[in-house]
Amino acid sequence: MAQRDKKDQEPTELRAPEITLCANSCGFPGNPATQNLCQNCFLAATASTSSPSSLSSPVLDKQPPRPAAPLVEPQAPLPPPVEEMASALATAPAPVAKTSAVNRCSRCRKRVGLTGFRCRCGHLFCGEHRYSDRHGCSYDYKSAARDAIARDNPVVRAAKIVRF
């Protein structure tokens, strides 16, 4: 009960923090953390104080870097003469037009577009034939899983204990 009386005696009103205007008299509110400057004036002040030091650093950076070892440029092979290129083009077969991407189910030949499912056997299937038991998949999942487990979990054998 004593706690309740103590709460009743304390004032519960909220006080707004005092607003101080910018020290440069620009009319915006200042922040005590930035020496009572507004954000714009503080950024301008920090930019002006950091600019002399930034001017001296590029002068030092303008010196060319010294290479550790002399660079030796590898000689590129000379291109073959024009006559050889012409004969090579004449003997090369004509380029075959690219075939469009397969976008039909390998089982029912239904158009699947972007909704097709590519199986591990390498074929594309529709939603009905996407499972291996539905399309008679030739991929051996059991041996692939067995090999993956054997590869990822090598057998660890301790050295034989020699007793004297």
Curated annotation (Swiss-Prot):
Protein name per UniProt: Zinc finger A20 and AN1 domain-containing stress-associated protein 1
Family matches, as SMART domains: ZnF_A20 (SM00259), ZnF_AN1 (SM00154)
Entry's induction text: By cold, dehydration, salt, submergence, mechanical wounding, heavy metals, and abscisic acid.
Pfam families: zf-A20, zf-AN1
Chain positions of all zinc fingers (A20-type): 16-50
Zinc finger motifs (AN1-type), residue ranges: 99-145
SUPFAM superfamilies: AN1-like Zinc finger, Glucocorticoid receptor-like (DNA-binding domain)
PROSITE patterns with a match to the protein in the record: ZF_A20, ZF_AN1
Biased composition (Low complexity): 48-58
Function: May be involved in environmental stress response.
